[in-house]
Design a protein with these regions (language model features):
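Active-site beta->alpha loop and helix N-cap motifs at the rims of alpha/beta catalytic domains
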Residues: 2-146
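Catalytic alpha/beta core domains of metabolic enzymes, predominantly
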Residues: 128-129, 140-177
Length: 177
């Protein structure tokens, strides 16, 4: 399935801009700096990568550029797979070209405030269509819902697609669970 096991420290790449456009020279510098710094994998177009502010063409350009500059040196995670509509998200995943990526990162539905059962069902639908392993991104400050440790454990037991968790709840007790 994926060429690499994701281990260690991953960096969510910023997407630099100049005069309202993606600054690809600066993005290359960011990628090279991270690789030289010894990180173990890169995340392109996560929350930090401004995916929500880019149009689909710009997103694809950033992803393709990141693949090109990385040149297979590190595992790559594509990080802009969150949506408050599960059907729309799974449709996006089903038609997305994941060539060059080793995993995808997906946040729970935003705004809707689903129950833990709703979050579980959402992620199971994502797992059904994803050709890649999934990093669960728990970021309640952006989604208005917290993915509990119990739900994460339930997902991990339900499907081998769930590879890791990016825990951004800001709760050390939860992170330790």
């Amino acid at each position: 399935m994926n060429r690499f096991r994701l281990r260690g420290t991953g960096v969510a790449l910023v997407t630099p801009f100049k005069n309202g456009k993606v600054d690809f020279d600066a993005l290359e510098n960011v990628i090279e700096h991270c690789i030289r710094g010894g990180v173990e994998f890169l995340v392109s177009l996560g929350t930090t990568g401004e995916a929500i502010t880019l149009n689909p063409k710009e997103c694809r350009e950033v992803l393709d550029f990141t693949i090109k500059i990385n040149a297979g040196r590190l595992p790559l995670v594509v990080g802009f797979f969150g949506d408050n509509d599960t059907a729309r998200l799974t449709e996006k995943i089903a038609h997305f070209d994941f060539t060059g990526f080793d995993a995808l990162m997906s946040s729970s539905p935003s705004y809707n405030k689903p129950s833990q059962e709703g979050i579980f069902q959402h992620y199971m639908k994502v797992a059904e269509v994803s050709p890649l392993p999934i990093i669960i991104y728990n970021v309640p400050s952006r989604t208005a819902s917290n993915v509990t440790a119990a739900t994460i454990l339930r997902l991990a037991h339900a499907s081998e697609k769930f590879l890791a968790v990016k825990e951004a709840a800001g709760d050390m007790v939860q992170a330790m669970q």
